[in-house]
Amino acid sequence: MPRVMWKNFHLCFPSNLTKPSSSPSGATSDDPNRPSILLINNFNLLYDDSSAAHRRLSKPLIHDVEPSSTFTASTSTAANSSSSSASYDDSDNYGFAPDDDSPPPDLTAVLASRRFFFSSPGCSNSITDSPDLRCRDNYDTATRLLTGGTAVKHYVQSPDPYNDFRRSMQEMIDAVTNAGDLRRYEFLHELLLSYLSLNAADTHKFIIRAFADILVSLLSDGHRIS
């Protein structure tokens, strides 16, 4: 019984799969659009589709390019790039013609404007402050110097500030007396203000006391102060 079924098993499939049709003409066999005929020789070919896949992929998807044309295209591209680079190399300023007669840039206006230069800071370290600004505290404490003199601020811890101030004032008055300017009242007023502004507040009592003693001595000696 199994032998009979195996012999008649091919009758279960259509006859056109087992028996190939008449061979077509040579013109039709070369037509790539004509579907191929699958021949089944045995039972395993029903599940093995490798032959059909091979036939479907027999036509190449990517056409090969001849090496000569590729080399020609690459050569022409390289020639174009070399010519363009040579044209940029022959000229300056990225393709602009050089101007030999152009004078060098003048930076005098830039240096004169001092836009990019900053002077020494004043009251703060901020670069946005104007260099003309000054601390007003310095103006408040500064005093006009004596006529023809130069004041030097020097801090000294003295054990006897009264005598030191009196001796210093006396030396300045003697220098002015020799010059003949002692008869001016403005000089003594400037002298007192200078000592008061250049010294701390706790020494003002010694300064006023020394100045008063010198003024009394001048009046007692017969000096006329106008």
Swiss-Prot record:
Where in or outside the cell it occurs: the entry states: Nucleus
Domain of life, source organism: Eukaryota
Q: Which GO terms describe its cellular component?
A: nucleus
- Region described as Disordered: spans on this chain: 68-104
Q: Which GO terms describe its biological process?
A: negative regulation of DNA-templated transcription
Instruction: List all Low complexity biased stretches.
Output: 68-87
Give the UniProt tissue specificity note.
Expressed in roots, shoots, stems, flower buds and siliques.
User: Which residue ranges traverse the bilayer?
Assistant: none
* Stretch forming the signal peptide: none
Question: Other comments?
Answer: Plants over-expressing OFP12 have no visible phenotype.
Q: How does it assemble?
A: Interacts with KNAT1, KNAT2, KNAT3 and KNAT4.
Q: What is this protein called?
A: Transcription repressor OFP12
* Protein source organism: Arabidopsis thaliana (Mouse-ear cress)
Q: Which gene encodes it?
A: OFP12
